Amino acid sequence: MITKPDKNVIRKKRHNRVRRTLSGTAERPRLNVYRSNKNIYAQLIDDNAGVTVASASTADKELAIGGGNVESAKQVGAAIAKRAIDKGYKSIVFDRGGYLYHGRIKALAEAAREEGLEF
């Protein structure tokens, strides 16, 4: 019997391969994206200190307004960019988390760029 491999296992392998070379610093934190079935989460992470600098998600009360999945991702991207700029971060490293740069991930990244983040 042929079994299909679990998509999340493949994504995690892909993410680990990318993470070997990708790292966030205090000057240029890593923007990590996680996509679940219901929500999308974004974190700015300083990997040297092991600290989350800022975060935003559709689980936040002010961002849980709704709309479509892509519209919600745009709101999260704008919110994480605003929070990053408020804390003094203009340039970041984008970590798509092993997901394809398409749909919700692309919408979040483009909204963050429109708000002024550079990556």
From Swiss-Prot:
Pfam families: Ribosomal_L18p (PF00861). Gene3D superfamilies: 3.30.420.100. This is one of the proteins that bind and probably mediate the attachment of the 5S RNA into the large ribosomal subunit, where it forms part of the central protuberance. GO terms for cellular component: cytosolic large ribosomal subunit. NCBIfam families: L18_bact. SUPFAM superfamilies: Translational machinery components. It comes from Oceanobacillus iheyensis (strain DSM 14371 / CIP 107618 / JCM 11309 / KCTC 3954 / HTE831). GO terms for biological process: translation. The gene is rplR. Part of the 50S ribosomal subunit; part of the 5S rRNA/L5/L18/L25 subcomplex. Contacts the 5S and 23S rRNAs. GO terms for molecular function: 5S rRNA binding; structural constituent of ribosome. This is Large ribosomal subunit protein uL18. The keyword Ribosomal protein applies. Belongs to the universal ribosomal protein uL18 family. Keywords: Ribonucleoprotein, Ribosomal protein, RNA-binding, rRNA-binding.
